[in-house]
């Protein structure tokens, strides 16, 4: 027992002794009042620089102490280490004086540069030269005053040839981007003086006209332009130059007018010959980033910013030519992919995958970084063959096996190196990472641990039980880690941990001052054993920073390892067979310290050395040669001819002999007993098999190269139920997201225009989706109590809980706010226990996170305040039941944030409609049993919308609000409701929606209520409608005819048919009048998709339709049916195809596509020359039945989607995305400063009657691609900037339409009162309205709201008259009633002022100068020398001048009165009566008598002195009445003038004396009545 006690005592003493002798590194700490902005090491040095509070400090002892640099006297905004010279660094200021050191910070000198002024917009950037470090460029952006960094800013470059020893010189070119050819160590391009620059030429509009690439060997004293084919200087925009390894990449934006355009990359190895890479990447929403590359391959990521919540990237790698790229990995979460240092081909990446169990808790740090709450999980994978294969990361833990769906997932696996970059560490395969084991990365940071790998990331072990930031020293033999907790509230680190055995064991060391770690670093090459830990203290009251210097130099007594302490480490060993994998034809070996060896490598500033071991050549060491590509069908390394490449290589050649494979550039494999022929075969190719036949046809150059058309096929389970394009921004070209719902209740999303689709990972049954008016807004409706909300076009969805299930009694589930994405109204159903259900409205202002009940028993609600021009933004209208026992609907208004009860606006309504900035309410007048229309423009005041007198709308009659885009409301009122024979009247309102007139009768509609009415996009006032020609029959089959209006519904004509069909044959009815032979088109009511319109808003003047030529419209299946095209707004037409075709416009009309809509097909037809010629293109190997053809709603894209029935399974659908993006070799040149030399021309719509270009009172000019310029695309060119309003035209009959209660007589084109109504009826109707005090005498015409005509013929003279008994209000309104204070101000105030002035003048100027007696002695013709008034000051001088002027004036007046007495008094009376007897709203003209008294000789012949316009005029007393002469530009209107009063032609000239005054009075008429 005693012996046992002794043993325990010995053991305890030994343990205590071991604790007291445990190694602790040397630690020192420096306290600072604020944290450092930047901290960096000089390479191969113990010296580092720190930027803190605009002061630059230096430490020469690995951070143990710091001192300010005395040579620097100015505030420093940033500093930069020179990668070409490890002794040099630069410190930049906000002045012309900058600082440079060339001895690692010991001494600093200044250099001056004209770089900074008030317009500089960015931090200056230095461009380095690896061959001659003294050659440097420095640049900054200079922007127009008050503007941020944008396209209008100029990039200013300065250069030095002596390392800034002399003042830098400005480059002589205004470059956009400049790069040295020797921007990398391995570049073989050019020489040390070679500089590449891009230069953009702008016009006065700020548009890029040309983009050039130049090089120079003398800093642009001379320059040479580099021509890149097919990149023309006028096409696209060069946005960047990259030098990566020995590759030079020129990155260009395909559409220079769109910053989110597709990009192209042109690659060169000599800087002279460039070839376009097949990098067909849509980076419309993202950024291209180049990753560490090699001489054998370029690597890059494309960050996809399509999702604002969860950003992913795609990872691409090229072949050794840099021309052919392969997507190696998709959905890289946050772009988090990292190459393992020192090991070729090794990468670790985090991948975003759809989560089946979305996290609904509070956001953690990871949630903010990676969007953890957005139904995405993160899975980590590793590749050891340059991304060709990826596998889950193996954890050496028996409880976590990959086959059990468990692996290691890493949040971070990088350290901050001495240069300030994040790297995996300069070690021989030793890595550290923070993460967790399981199916995916944890969403909470505190669940993560720290793991270590010793085989380059293939397998891992747990190192620490908490997450940590870390750094490596002595090639990984010293590891320092500081705990870092990612909770919202977390404790500061009180310890740090270190390992001296490559992460196998760890020791803990206390920190004197706990910190939140900000940085931990060591020397750049990771060979030092000294570390720096920087962080802020845990006090919330201050931001003190502590910098710890930790020194492990004395560990193991500083022993240096011997040969026996090293082992051979072979990289890239496979998990399967433990054999090393060959990459680039070699294996990699490292000589590293054994894990348990107690010594250090101790080779300070010596990088890790790689031992290369060549491998036997295999198929993997070869790649496809020029003209070939990897086969998509074969899994092996099989290369097949590439039609795209060969079409370029075969130019002017008939045959090619090419090797199908080549050895990868830089590959080090050993051929051994193999021969080159064992891997490569020489192929002979006939160019005729690969070159488009039409491509070389000089007679038909208009169809592009069909080899550039790409087809992408996607298969879906279930039939198509719903699809919609979703815009991502206000940019008209950004609607590339497509949402598809199938009949099996699944939803698929594409964010690349239909090239690929991803299924939304929602297990709930999806009933449908709604797309809001705000870009990106999509909401999925499910059969559960959940909805899924997206604001990024469906890239991510947030799960929200709804208060109730959607109501089947409401025709929609959601009403959106027009401007605020977080607001919408939910319509749900709430049922009681007795089964009685009500439809309720619920409102949210936080995108569905919470809901509040808005109103019960609703039929629908809308945010009307957001659409009305002058309405309250929070105003909401709801139509709801008056009571549960009453089925009548009432209209209620309420405020979103108000607690007040809803206000009842109308007691009994049918419904309401929002039309542009109007709200139209259909109310029921119970007394008259009729339907009334009420209109509001502010949501508060409603006005009666009066229908024509002869149209009584019954409560059961349907009316449809069609359009309001032309400052008037178009409405269709059904007048015949007999099934299958429905039609009605097309009504049009005045500008405020209160008076409706008949625009067209017998307009066709269908049973559902849709109307054959199409407003043509892009053309003012052009409308196409179908009418029922046999309306009187009232039964049977409708005979439809198509009419077109070019003046907003005022006049209608039939469509003029083409003379011959598409086969050059005449039509049977050719030669007959239009009423027997016209073009008729199938309209809105017959479309499968109502979004398929005749026209396109971007393809101005283009219309396509299906129809026939004849007397009436024939059925679709009739043999006469064909497809027709118009390019001049419907004036002329041509037949383009026999049969029924679906059509779409692309690229603003430069691409037209047709697909057979009836028969199965495997081809489409396209035209690139505005429909002049058409080409057939086979898009599938078998025939399919096309259901729809679609593109973005703006018709500006070059991608089209065909929705088709799956040929193998008719229950499923397929999409064929036809991509014409590359069919044009260039972008059309737009130069508004020199329009004669670009690719556009002006086009004006021409009125079919008269042939003039005046439409709505003005001549407009629109830009279109010029005829014959069919080799270019438009893209986002701002053609609207070139729009010209050439002139305002004189008014003609075409600028007027019939006034309220007037109707157009088609026989003579005049407006007549509706049947059964007289002028007296009009007075009665208008005066019977509530609060009415005036009515108007109408001429029968009113100006079309769109018209801007001036002068010319005036048809619309409005004359206000008082309603009976309302004369007083009328006079007050027009300012004729003077009383009260008005009378005081108008009479007494001026009288008082006048009397005071007279008294003052009398006292100072008359009385003291002798009174009136003295003034009477003044003679007009005598000098005033005898009159010397008193003038003591300046006031006396002024007064005396007034007196003298008054004397002269009185004298003249007396003489004038005496003369006028001789004129006949009767004539004066008549003149006075006419002059002063003016009516409001009437023109001011003069009535002249025809007789004179005997004293007329006093003035000679009176008539001789009149204006020539009044010569020989004959007037009488009745001339005072206003008469409106109608002189039409069309002969038919003469009839109307004959039916009215006979007016003397000479009166017509007098009628136009004072047009401006009449316009002012008409404005007065439109003012509201006084209350």
From Swiss-Prot:
Record region (Disordered): 1527-1571
SUPFAM superfamilies hit by this protein: Oligoxyloglucan reducing end-specific cellobiohydrolase
In terms of Pfam families, this protein maps to: Sortilin-Vps10 (PF15902), Sortilin_C (PF15901)
What residue ranges lie in the Cytoplasmic compartment?
Answer: 1404-1571
Q: Name one GO cellular component term.
A: membrane
Positions annotated as BNR repeat: 451-461, 497-507, 788-797, 842-852, 1124-1134, 1165-1175
Q: Where is the signal peptide?
A: 1-22
Q: Where is the composition biased (Acidic residues)?
A: 1553-1562
- UniProt topological domain (Lumenal) ranges: 23-1382
UniProt keywords (A-Z) are: Glycoprotein, Golgi apparatus, Membrane, Protein transport, Receptor, Repeat, Signal, Transmembrane, Transmembrane helix, Transport
What does the record say about its membrane topology?
A: Single-pass type I membrane protein
Domain of life from the UniProt record: Eukaryota
* Membrane-spanning parts: 1383-1403
Give the location in the cell: Golgi apparatus, trans-Golgi network membrane; Prevacuolar compartment membrane
Described function? Functions as a sorting receptor in the Golgi compartment required for the intracellular sorting and delivery of soluble vacuolar proteins, like carboxypeptidase Y (CPY) and proteinase A. Executes multiple rounds of sorting by cycling between the late Golgi and a prevacuolar endosome-like compartment.
Q: Which family does it belong to?
A: Belongs to the VPS10-related sortilin family.
UniProt protein name? Vacuolar protein sorting/targeting protein 10
Originating species:
Candida dubliniensis (strain CD36 / ATCC MYA-646 / CBS 7987 / NCPF 3949 / NRRL Y-17841)
């Amino acid at each position: 027992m005693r012996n046992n006690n002794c043993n325990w005592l010995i053991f305890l003493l030994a343990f205590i002794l071991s604790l007291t002798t445990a190694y602790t590194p040397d630690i020192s700490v420096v306290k600072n009042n604020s944290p450092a902005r930047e901290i960096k090491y000089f390479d191969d040095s113990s010296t580092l620089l720190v930027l803190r509070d605009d002061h630059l400090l230096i430490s020469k002892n690995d951070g143990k102490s710091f001192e300010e640099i005395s040579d620097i006297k100015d505030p420093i905004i940033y500093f930069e280490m020179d990668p070409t010279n490890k002794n040099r660094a630069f410190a930049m200021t906000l002045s012309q004086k900058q600082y440079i050191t060339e001895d690692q910070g010991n001494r600093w000198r200044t250099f001056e540069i004209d770089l900074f002024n008030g317009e500089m917009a960015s931090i200056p950037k230095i461009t380095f030269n690896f061959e001659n470090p003294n050659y440097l460029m420095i640049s900054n952006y200079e922007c127009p005053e008050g503007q941020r960094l944008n396209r209008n800013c100029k990039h200013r470059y300065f250069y030095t040839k002596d390392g800034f020893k002399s003042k830098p010189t400005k480059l002589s070119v205004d470059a956009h981007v400049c790069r040295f050819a020797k921007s990398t160590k391995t570049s073989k391009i050019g020489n040390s003086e070679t500089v590449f620059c891009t230069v953009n030429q702008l016009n006065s509009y700020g548009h890029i006209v040309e983009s050039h690439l130049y090089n120079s060997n003398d800093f642009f004293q001379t320059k040479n332009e580099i021509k890149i084919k097919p990149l023309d200087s006028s096409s696209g925009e060069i946005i960047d130059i990259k030098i990566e390894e020995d590759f030079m990449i020129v990155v260009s934006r395909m559409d220079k007018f769109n910053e989110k355009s597709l990009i192209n990359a042109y690659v060169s190895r000599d800087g002279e010959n460039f070839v376009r890479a097949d990098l067909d990447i849509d980076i419309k929403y993202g950024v291209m980033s180049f990753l560490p590359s090699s001489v054998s391959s370029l690597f890059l990521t494309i960050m996809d910013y399509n999702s604002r919540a969860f950003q992913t990237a795609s990872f691409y790698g090229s072949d050794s030519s840099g021309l052919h790229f392969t997507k190696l990995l998709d959905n890289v979460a946050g772009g988090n992919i990292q190459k393992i240092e020192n090991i070729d081909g090794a990468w670790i990446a985090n991948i975003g995958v759809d989560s089946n169990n979305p996290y609904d808790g509070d956001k953690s740090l990871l949630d903010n970084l990676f969007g953890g709450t957005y139904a995405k999980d993160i899975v980590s994978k590793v590749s050891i063959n340059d991304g060709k294969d990826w596998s889950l990361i193996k954890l050496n833990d028996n409880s976590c096996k990959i086959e059990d769906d468990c692996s290691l997932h890493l949040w971070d696996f990088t350290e901050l190196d001495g240069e300030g970059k994040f790297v995996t560490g300069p070690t021989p395969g030793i890595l550290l990472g923070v993460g967790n084991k399981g199916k995916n990365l944890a969403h909470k940071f505190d669940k993560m641990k720290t793991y270590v790998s010793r085989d380059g990331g293939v397998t891992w072990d747990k190192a620490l039980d908490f997450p940590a930031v870390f750094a490596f020293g002595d090639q990984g033999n010293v590891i320092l880690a500081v705990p870092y907790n990612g909770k919202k509230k977390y404790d500061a680190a009180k310890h740090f941990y270190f390992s001296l055995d490559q992460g196998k064991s760890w020791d803990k060391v206390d920190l004197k001052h706990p910190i939140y770690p900000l940085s931990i670093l060591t020397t750049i090459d990771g060979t030092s054993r000294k570390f720096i830990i920087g962080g802020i203290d845990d006090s919330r009251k201050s931001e003190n920073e502590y910098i710890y210097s930790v020194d492990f130099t004395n560990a193991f007594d500083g022993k240096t390892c011997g040969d026996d302490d090293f082992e051979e480490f072979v990289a890239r060993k496979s998990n399967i067979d433990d054999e090393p994998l060959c990459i680039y034809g070699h294996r990699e070996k490292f000589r590293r310290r054994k894990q348990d060896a107690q010594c250090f490598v101790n080779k300070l500033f010596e990088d890790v050395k790689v031992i290369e071991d060549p491998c036997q050549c295999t198929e993997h060491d070869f790649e496809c040669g020029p003209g070939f590509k990897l086969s998509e069908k074969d899994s092996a390394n099989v290369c097949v001819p590439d039609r795209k490449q060969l079409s370029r290589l075969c130019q002017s050649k008939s045959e090619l002999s090419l090797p199908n494979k080549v050895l990868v550039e830089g590959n080090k494999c050993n051929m051994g007993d193999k021969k080159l022929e064992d891997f490569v075969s020489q192929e002979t190719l006939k160019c005729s098999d690969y070159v488009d036949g039409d491509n070389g046809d000089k007679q038909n150059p208009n169809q592009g190269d069909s080899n550039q058309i790409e087809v992408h096929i996607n298969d879906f389970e279930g039939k198509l139920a719903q699809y919609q394009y979703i815009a991502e921004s206000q940019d008209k070209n950004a609607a590339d997201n497509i949402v598809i719902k199938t009949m099996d209740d699944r939803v698929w999303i594409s964010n690349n225009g239909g090239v690929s689709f991803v299924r939304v990972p929602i297990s709930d049954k999806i009933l449908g989706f709604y797309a809001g008016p705000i870009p990106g807004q999509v909401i999925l409706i499910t059969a559960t109590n959940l909805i899924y909300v997206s604001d990024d076009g469906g890239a991510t969805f947030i799960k929200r809980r709804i208060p109730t299930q959607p109501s089947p009694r409401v025709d929609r589930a959601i009403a959106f706010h027009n401007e605020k994405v977080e607001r919408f109204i939910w319509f749900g159903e709430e049922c009681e226990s007795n089964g009685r259900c009500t439809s309720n409205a619920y409102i949210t202002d936080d995108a569905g996170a919470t809901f509040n009940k808005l109103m019960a028993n609703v039929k629908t609600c809308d945010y009307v305040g957001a659409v009305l021009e002058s309405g309250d933004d929070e105003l909401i209208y709801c139509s709801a039941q008056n009571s549960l026992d009453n089925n009548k609907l009432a209209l209620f208004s309420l405020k979103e944030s108000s607690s007040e009860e809803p206000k009842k606006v109308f007691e009994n309504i049918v419904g309401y409609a929002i039309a542009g900035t109007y709200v139209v309410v259909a109310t029921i007048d119970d007394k008259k049993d009729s339907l009334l229309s009420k209109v509001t423009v502010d949501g508060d005041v409603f006005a009666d919308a009066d229908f024509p007198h002869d149209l009584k709308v019954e409560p059961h009659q349907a009316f449809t609000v069609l359009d309001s885009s032309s400052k008037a409301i178009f409405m269709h009122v059904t007048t015949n409701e007999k099934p299958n024979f429905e039609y009605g009247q097309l009504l049009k309102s005045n500008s405020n929606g209160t008076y409706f007139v008949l625009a067209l009768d017998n307009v066709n509609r269908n049973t559902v209520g849709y109307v054959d009415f199409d407003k043509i996009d892009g053309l003012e006032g052009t409308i196409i409608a179908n009418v029922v020609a046999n309306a009187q029959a009232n039964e049977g089959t409708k005979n439809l005819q198509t009419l077109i209006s070019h003046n907003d519904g005022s006049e209608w004509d039939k469509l003029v048919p083409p003379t011959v069909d598409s086969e050059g044959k005449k039509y049977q009815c050719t030669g007959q009048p239009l009423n027997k032979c016209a073009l008729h088109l199938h309209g809105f009511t017959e479309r499968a998709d109502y979004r398929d319109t005749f026209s396109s808003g971007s393809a101005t003047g283009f219309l396509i339709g299906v129809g026939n030529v004849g007397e009436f419209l024939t059925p679709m299946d009739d043999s006469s049916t064909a497809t027709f095209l118009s390019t001049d707004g419907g004036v002329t037409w041509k037949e383009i195809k026999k049969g029924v075709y679906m059509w779409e416009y692309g690229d603003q009309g430069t691409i037209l596509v047709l697909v057979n809509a009836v028969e199965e097909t495997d081809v489409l037809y396209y035209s690139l020359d505005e429909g002049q010629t058409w080409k057939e293109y086979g898009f599938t190997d078998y025939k399919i039945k096309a259901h729809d053809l679609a593109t973005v709603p703006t018709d500006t894209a070059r991608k089209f989607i065909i929705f088709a029935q799956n040929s193998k399974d008719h229950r499923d659908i397929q999409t064929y995305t036809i991509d014409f993006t590359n069919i044009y070799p260039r972008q059309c040149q737009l130069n508004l400063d020199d329009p004669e030399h670009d690719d556009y021309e002006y086009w004006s719509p021409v009125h079919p009657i008269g042939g003039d270009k005046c439409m709505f009172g003005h001549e407009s000019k629109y830009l279109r691609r010029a005829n014959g310029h069919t080799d270019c695309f438009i893209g986002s060119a701002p053609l609207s900037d070139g729009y010209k309003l050439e002139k305002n035209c004189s008014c003609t009959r075409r600028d007027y339409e019939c006034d309220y209660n007037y109707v157009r007589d088609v026989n003579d084109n005049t407006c007549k009162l509706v049947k059964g109504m007289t002028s007296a009826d009009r007075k009665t109707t208008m005066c019977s309205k509530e609060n009415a005090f005036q009515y108007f005498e109408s001429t029968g015409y009113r100006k079309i709201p769109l018209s801007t005509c001036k002068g010319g013929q005036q048809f619309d003279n409005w004359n206000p008259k008082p309603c009976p008994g309302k004369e007083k209000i009328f006079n007050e309104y027009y300012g004729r009633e003077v009383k009260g204070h008005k009378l005081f101000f108008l009479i007494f105030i001026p009288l008082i002022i006048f009397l005071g002035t007279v008294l003052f003048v009398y006292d100072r100027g008359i009385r003291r100068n002798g009174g009136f007696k003295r003034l009477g002695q003044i003679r007009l013709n005598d000098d005033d020398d005898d009159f010397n008034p008193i003038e003591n000051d300046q006031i006396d001088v002024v007064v005396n001048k007034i007196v003298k002027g008054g004397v002269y004036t009185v004298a003249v007046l007396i003489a004038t009165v005496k003369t006028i007495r001789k004129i006949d008094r009767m004539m004066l009376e008549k003149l006075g009566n006419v002059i002063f007897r003016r009516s409001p709203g009437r023109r001011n003209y003069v009535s002249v008598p025809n007789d004179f008294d005997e004293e007329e000789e006093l003035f000679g012949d009176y008539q001789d002195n009149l204006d020539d316009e009044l010569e020989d005029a004959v007037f009488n007393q009745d001339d005072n009445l206003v008469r409106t002469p109608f002189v039409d530009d069309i002969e038919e209107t003469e009839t109307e003038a004959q039916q009215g009063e006979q007016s003397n032609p000479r009166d017509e000239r007098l009628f136009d004396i004072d047009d401006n005054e009449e316009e002012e009075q008409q404005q007065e008429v439109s003012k509201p009545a006084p209350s």
